[in-house]
Amino acid sequence: MARVTVQDAVEKIGNRFDLVLVAARRARQLQVGAKDPLVPEENDKMTVIALREIEEGLINGKILDARERQEQQEQEAAELQAVSAIAEGRR
């Protein structure tokens, strides 16, 4: 199990309140299986993995926002394509 110091992660994010928000978002992504860990799991809990990713500079609020925007755009494009295919089938 890797040892994570919150102070190291706080320095990467800026303050402890934003750290909690970013770590919680990332841990939730990992927990539901939406994303794969960017660091070895080493039998750690998802919150520890999220903190290790933050500590190593692999994840921050801007990165999470950009990834979520990209995923949303991809989902919207897929939905639009599906609607177009349905509309074409009715003609």
Swiss-Prot record:
Biological process according to GO: DNA-templated transcription
Lineage top rank: taxon: Bacteria
InterPro entries in alphabetical order: DNA-dir_RNA_pol_omega, Pol_omega/Rpo6/RPB6, RPB6/omega-like_sf
One GO MF term: DNA binding
Pfam families assigned: RNA_pol_Rpb6
Record flagged with keyword rRNA processing: no
UniProt keyword Signal present: no
One Gene Ontology CC term in the entry: DNA-directed RNA polymerase complex
EC number: 2.7.7.6
Keyword annotations: DNA-directed RNA polymerase, Nucleotidyltransferase, Transcription, Transferase
Broad enzyme group: transferase
Catalytic activity annotation: RNA(n) + a ribonucleoside 5'-triphosphate = RNA(n+1) + diphosphate
Assembly with partners or alone: The RNAP catalytic core consists of 2 alpha, 1 beta, 1 beta' and 1 omega subunit. When a sigma factor is associated with the core the holoenzyme is formed, which can initiate transcription.
Functional summary from the UniProt entry: Promotes RNA polymerase assembly. Latches the N- and C-terminal regions of the beta' subunit thereby facilitating its interaction with the beta and alpha subunits.
Family: Belongs to the RNA polymerase subunit omega family.
Name assigned to this protein: DNA-directed RNA polymerase subunit omega
Gene, per the UniProt record: rpoZ
